[in-house]
Amino acid sequence: MKITSKLAAILCAAALFMTVGCSNGGETSSGSSEPDASGSSGTADVSSASDSETNESGTVSEEKIMDSLNNGIIIDSVSGNVYKNEMNANPISPNIFCADPTAVEYDGRLYVYGTNDQQQAEEGTKNDYAYIKSLVVFSTDDMVNWIYHGRIEVGEIAPWINNSWAPSIASRVEDDGLTHFYLYFSNGGAGVGVITSTDPVGPWTDPLGEPLVYQNMPGLENCPAPFDPGVCIDENGVGWLSFGGGTPADGNTMHSKIPKIAKLGKDMLSFDSEFVSIDAPYFFEASELNYIDGVYYYTYCTD
Protein backbone atom coordinates (compact mmCIF):
# COMPACT_ATOMS: atom_id res chain seq x y z
CA MET A 1 0.00 0.00 0.00
CA LYS A 2 1.48 3.37 -1.00
CA ILE A 3 1.15 5.96 1.73
CA THR A 4 0.73 9.48 0.34
CA SER A 5 1.06 12.90 1.90
CA LYS A 6 -2.74 13.03 1.84
CA LEU A 7 -2.92 10.04 4.14
CA ALA A 8 -0.34 11.61 6.40
CA ALA A 9 -2.40 14.76 6.68
CA ILE A 10 -5.60 12.83 7.30
CA LEU A 11 -3.86 10.71 9.89
CA CYS A 12 -2.66 13.77 11.77
CA ALA A 13 -6.08 15.40 11.63
CA ALA A 14 -7.90 12.32 12.90
CA ALA A 15 -8.06 11.07 16.46
CA LEU A 16 -4.60 9.63 16.13
CA PHE A 17 -3.54 9.63 19.73
CA MET A 18 -6.73 8.91 21.64
CA THR A 19 -7.17 7.75 25.21
CA VAL A 20 -5.03 4.70 25.87
CA GLY A 21 -6.77 1.39 25.32
CA CYS A 22 -5.87 -2.08 24.02
CA SER A 23 -4.88 -2.87 20.45
CA ASN A 24 -6.55 -5.50 18.29
CA GLY A 25 -5.66 -9.07 19.17
CA GLY A 26 -3.88 -11.46 16.83
CA GLU A 27 -0.52 -11.06 15.18
CA THR A 28 -0.06 -7.31 15.52
CA SER A 29 3.25 -5.49 15.61
CA SER A 30 3.56 -3.01 18.44
CA GLY A 31 7.30 -2.39 18.54
CA SER A 32 9.51 -2.52 21.59
CA SER A 33 8.22 -1.79 25.04
CA GLU A 34 9.80 0.75 27.35
CA PRO A 35 12.39 -0.78 29.71
CA ASP A 36 11.38 -1.24 33.32
CA ALA A 37 13.31 0.02 36.32
CA SER A 38 15.85 -2.78 35.95
CA GLY A 39 16.55 -1.78 32.35
CA SER A 40 14.88 -4.83 30.81
CA SER A 41 11.98 -4.85 28.40
CA GLY A 42 9.85 -7.49 26.78
CA THR A 43 6.47 -8.64 25.60
CA ALA A 44 3.84 -10.86 27.09
CA ASP A 45 1.51 -13.29 25.34
CA VAL A 46 -1.54 -13.24 27.56
CA SER A 47 -2.92 -16.37 25.89
CA SER A 48 -1.03 -18.24 28.60
CA ALA A 49 -2.99 -16.54 31.35
CA SER A 50 -4.43 -18.77 34.03
CA ASP A 51 -8.10 -19.71 34.18
CA SER A 52 -8.57 -17.33 37.08
CA GLU A 53 -7.56 -14.43 34.83
CA THR A 54 -10.13 -15.15 32.11
CA ASN A 55 -13.85 -14.49 32.10
CA GLU A 56 -16.66 -16.86 31.11
CA SER A 57 -16.15 -16.25 27.38
CA GLY A 58 -12.51 -17.31 27.60
CA THR A 59 -11.25 -13.77 27.11
CA VAL A 60 -8.56 -12.36 29.36
CA SER A 61 -10.09 -9.93 31.81
CA GLU A 62 -9.89 -6.20 31.27
CA GLU A 63 -8.20 -5.85 34.65
CA LYS A 64 -5.43 -8.25 33.58
CA ILE A 65 -4.90 -6.40 30.31
CA MET A 66 -4.81 -2.96 31.90
CA ASP A 67 -2.48 -4.22 34.62
CA SER A 68 -0.10 -5.43 31.91
CA LEU A 69 -0.26 -2.10 30.10
CA ASN A 70 0.36 -0.14 33.28
CA ASN A 71 3.50 -2.18 33.86
CA GLY A 72 4.86 -1.31 30.43
CA ILE A 73 4.25 -4.73 28.85
CA ILE A 74 2.99 -5.02 25.29
CA ILE A 75 0.23 -7.57 24.70
CA ASP A 76 0.84 -9.53 21.51
CA SER A 77 -2.33 -11.63 21.49
CA VAL A 78 -5.43 -12.39 23.51
CA SER A 79 -6.93 -15.85 23.98
CA GLY A 80 -10.55 -16.60 23.21
CA ASN A 81 -12.65 -13.81 21.77
CA VAL A 82 -10.73 -10.71 20.74
CA TYR A 83 -10.80 -8.00 23.39
CA LYS A 84 -11.15 -4.42 22.28
CA ASN A 85 -12.65 -1.54 24.17
CA GLU A 86 -13.85 0.41 21.16
CA MET A 87 -14.48 3.54 23.19
CA ASN A 88 -10.87 3.73 24.40
CA ALA A 89 -8.81 2.26 21.60
CA ASN A 90 -5.52 3.70 20.43
CA PRO A 91 -4.68 2.24 17.00
CA ILE A 92 -0.98 3.07 17.29
CA SER A 93 0.19 2.87 20.89
CA PRO A 94 -1.53 0.90 23.65
CA ASN A 95 0.94 1.82 26.37
CA ILE A 96 2.83 4.98 25.43
CA PHE A 97 1.04 8.29 26.02
CA CYS A 98 1.57 10.72 23.12
CA ALA A 99 0.06 13.91 21.73
CA ASP A 100 0.34 16.48 18.93
CA PRO A 101 1.14 14.12 16.03
CA THR A 102 3.02 15.01 12.87
CA ALA A 103 3.90 12.63 10.03
CA VAL A 104 6.23 12.16 7.09
CA GLU A 105 6.48 9.44 4.44
CA TYR A 106 9.82 7.86 3.61
CA ASP A 107 10.72 4.73 1.65
CA GLY A 108 7.22 3.26 1.82
CA ARG A 109 6.72 3.87 5.54
CA LEU A 110 4.80 6.53 7.42
CA TYR A 111 6.69 7.95 10.41
CA VAL A 112 4.62 9.61 13.13
CA TYR A 113 6.15 11.83 15.81
CA GLY A 114 4.51 13.15 18.95
CA THR A 115 5.01 14.90 22.27
CA ASN A 116 6.16 12.37 24.85
CA ASP A 117 3.37 12.70 27.40
CA GLN A 118 4.65 9.46 28.94
CA GLN A 119 7.20 11.57 30.84
CA GLN A 120 4.37 12.90 32.99
CA ALA A 121 3.67 9.38 34.28
CA GLU A 122 7.22 8.33 35.11
CA GLU A 123 8.01 7.60 38.72
CA GLY A 124 10.31 10.09 40.39
CA THR A 125 9.63 12.91 37.93
CA LYS A 126 7.52 16.03 38.14
CA ASN A 127 4.24 15.04 36.51
CA ASP A 128 3.70 18.13 34.44
CA TYR A 129 3.90 18.91 30.74
CA ALA A 130 6.22 21.80 31.61
CA TYR A 131 9.04 19.27 32.10
CA ILE A 132 8.69 17.33 28.84
CA LYS A 133 11.94 17.39 26.85
CA SER A 134 11.56 14.41 24.52
CA LEU A 135 9.51 13.24 21.55
CA VAL A 136 8.46 9.75 20.44
CA VAL A 137 8.33 8.16 17.00
CA PHE A 138 6.32 5.30 15.47
CA SER A 139 6.18 3.94 11.91
CA THR A 140 4.00 1.72 9.72
CA ASP A 141 3.90 0.43 6.15
CA ASP A 142 0.25 -0.66 6.17
CA MET A 143 -1.53 1.73 8.61
CA VAL A 144 -2.37 -1.27 10.82
CA ASN A 145 0.86 -2.64 12.31
CA TRP A 146 3.06 -0.11 14.07
CA ILE A 147 6.66 -0.10 15.29
CA TYR A 148 7.69 2.03 18.25
CA HIS A 149 11.17 3.42 17.60
CA GLY A 150 11.59 4.97 21.03
CA ARG A 151 12.33 8.45 22.25
CA ILE A 152 14.06 11.38 20.65
CA GLU A 153 15.85 12.96 23.61
CA VAL A 154 15.65 16.55 22.45
CA GLY A 155 16.86 17.88 25.80
CA GLU A 156 20.14 16.00 25.34
CA ILE A 157 20.51 16.90 21.66
CA ALA A 158 19.79 20.59 22.32
CA PRO A 159 20.58 21.32 26.00
CA TRP A 160 19.41 24.94 25.72
CA ILE A 161 15.72 24.02 25.34
CA ASN A 162 13.03 24.49 27.97
CA ASN A 163 10.66 21.92 26.45
CA SER A 164 9.92 19.94 23.31
CA TRP A 165 6.22 19.89 22.44
CA ALA A 166 4.03 19.67 19.36
CA PRO A 167 6.51 18.71 16.62
CA SER A 168 6.12 19.25 12.89
CA ILE A 169 8.32 17.50 10.33
CA ALA A 170 9.25 17.90 6.67
CA SER A 171 11.77 16.19 4.41
CA ARG A 172 13.36 16.61 1.00
CA VAL A 173 16.19 15.21 -1.11
CA GLU A 174 19.09 17.65 -1.20
CA ASP A 175 22.22 18.22 -3.29
CA ASP A 176 24.13 15.44 -1.54
CA GLY A 177 21.54 12.93 -2.77
CA LEU A 178 20.31 12.21 0.75
CA THR A 179 16.87 12.79 2.21
CA HIS A 180 17.13 15.37 4.98
CA PHE A 181 14.55 15.51 7.77
CA TYR A 182 13.74 18.76 9.60
CA LEU A 183 11.90 18.26 12.88
CA TYR A 184 10.58 21.52 14.34
CA PHE A 185 9.25 21.64 17.90
CA SER A 186 7.84 24.07 20.44
CA ASN A 187 10.38 25.33 22.95
CA GLY A 188 7.64 25.60 25.54
CA GLY A 189 5.50 28.62 24.70
CA ALA A 190 8.55 30.77 24.07
CA GLY A 191 9.58 29.79 20.56
CA VAL A 192 10.47 27.12 18.01
CA GLY A 193 13.56 24.95 17.69
CA VAL A 194 14.67 22.50 15.00
CA ILE A 195 16.75 19.33 14.89
CA THR A 196 17.86 17.54 11.73
CA SER A 197 18.79 14.07 10.51
CA THR A 198 19.29 12.05 7.33
CA ASP A 199 17.32 9.16 8.82
CA PRO A 200 13.71 9.38 10.07
CA VAL A 201 14.65 7.75 13.38
CA GLY A 202 17.95 9.59 13.87
CA PRO A 203 20.51 10.22 15.09
CA TRP A 204 19.49 13.87 15.31
CA THR A 205 21.65 16.97 15.56
CA ASP A 206 21.05 20.55 16.67
CA PRO A 207 22.32 22.67 13.75
CA LEU A 208 21.59 26.09 15.26
CA GLY A 209 22.40 25.74 18.95
CA GLU A 210 19.59 28.19 19.67
CA PRO A 211 15.91 28.69 18.80
CA LEU A 212 14.84 29.49 15.26
CA VAL A 213 11.90 31.54 16.57
CA TYR A 214 11.78 33.33 19.91
CA GLN A 215 9.62 35.80 21.84
CA ASN A 216 10.04 39.49 21.01
CA MET A 217 11.68 38.60 17.70
CA PRO A 218 11.28 41.52 15.24
CA GLY A 219 7.95 41.16 13.45
CA LEU A 220 6.29 39.15 16.23
CA GLU A 221 5.01 42.03 18.35
CA ASN A 222 1.42 40.73 18.43
CA CYS A 223 2.36 37.04 18.76
CA PRO A 224 2.68 36.48 22.53
CA ALA A 225 3.49 32.77 22.27
CA PRO A 226 5.41 31.97 19.05
CA PHE A 227 5.16 28.19 19.35
CA ASP A 228 3.31 25.22 17.78
CA PRO A 229 5.16 25.12 14.44
CA GLY A 230 3.65 23.82 11.23
CA VAL A 231 6.05 23.17 8.35
CA CYS A 232 5.57 22.12 4.74
CA ILE A 233 7.60 22.04 1.54
CA ASP A 234 5.89 22.98 -1.72
CA GLU A 235 6.31 21.48 -5.20
CA ASN A 236 9.27 23.79 -5.86
CA GLY A 237 11.16 22.56 -2.82
CA VAL A 238 10.50 25.77 -0.88
CA GLY A 239 9.85 25.44 2.84
CA TRP A 240 7.21 27.38 4.76
CA LEU A 241 6.77 27.66 8.53
CA SER A 242 3.68 28.75 10.43
CA PHE A 243 3.46 29.17 14.20
CA GLY A 244 1.85 31.18 16.97
CA GLY A 245 -0.32 31.06 20.03
CA GLY A 246 -2.41 33.46 22.06
CA THR A 247 -4.51 33.16 25.19
CA PRO A 248 -7.76 31.21 25.61
CA ALA A 249 -9.61 34.52 25.36
CA ASP A 250 -8.20 35.00 21.86
CA GLY A 251 -10.26 31.99 20.79
CA ASN A 252 -13.28 34.29 21.06
CA THR A 253 -11.75 36.92 18.77
CA MET A 254 -12.67 36.79 15.10
CA HIS A 255 -9.63 38.59 13.68
CA SER A 256 -6.75 38.39 16.17
CA LYS A 257 -4.18 37.85 13.38
CA ILE A 258 -1.87 36.22 15.92
CA PRO A 259 -0.53 33.28 13.85
CA LYS A 260 2.38 33.96 11.50
CA ILE A 261 3.83 32.37 8.39
CA ALA A 262 7.15 32.93 6.64
CA LYS A 263 9.20 31.46 3.82
CA LEU A 264 12.14 29.41 5.02
CA GLY A 265 15.61 29.83 3.61
CA LYS A 266 17.15 27.19 1.38
CA ASP A 267 18.81 25.68 4.44
CA MET A 268 15.42 25.29 6.22
CA LEU A 269 17.16 26.85 9.24
CA SER A 270 16.57 30.54 8.53
CA PHE A 271 13.89 32.81 7.07
CA ASP A 272 13.79 34.24 3.56
CA SER A 273 10.83 36.57 4.05
CA GLU A 274 9.14 38.76 6.61
CA PHE A 275 6.55 37.27 8.94
CA VAL A 276 3.01 37.62 7.61
CA SER A 277 -0.07 37.42 9.83
CA ILE A 278 -2.66 34.74 9.08
CA ASP A 279 -6.23 35.97 9.56
CA ALA A 280 -7.49 32.72 11.06
CA PRO A 281 -10.92 33.17 12.69
CA TYR A 282 -11.02 32.56 16.45
CA PHE A 283 -7.41 31.38 16.51
CA PHE A 284 -5.90 30.12 19.78
CA GLU A 285 -3.01 27.69 19.11
CA ALA A 286 -1.89 24.41 17.47
CA SER A 287 -0.78 25.61 14.03
CA GLU A 288 -0.23 22.98 11.35
CA LEU A 289 0.53 23.47 7.68
CA ASN A 290 0.12 20.97 4.84
CA TYR A 291 0.65 21.27 1.10
CA ILE A 292 -1.53 18.85 -0.88
CA ASP A 293 -2.02 18.87 -4.66
CA GLY A 294 -1.06 22.52 -5.02
CA VAL A 295 -3.15 23.74 -2.09
CA TYR A 296 -1.89 24.94 1.30
CA TYR A 297 -4.00 23.79 4.25
CA TYR A 298 -3.67 25.63 7.55
CA THR A 299 -5.31 23.98 10.57
CA TYR A 300 -5.42 25.22 14.14
CA CYS A 301 -7.25 25.09 17.47
CA THR A 302 -9.78 27.66 18.68
CA ASP A 303 -10.02 26.47 22.29
Language-model features, listed with the residues they occupy:
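Post-signal peptide N-terminal segment of mature Sec-exported envelope proteins
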Residues: 30-65
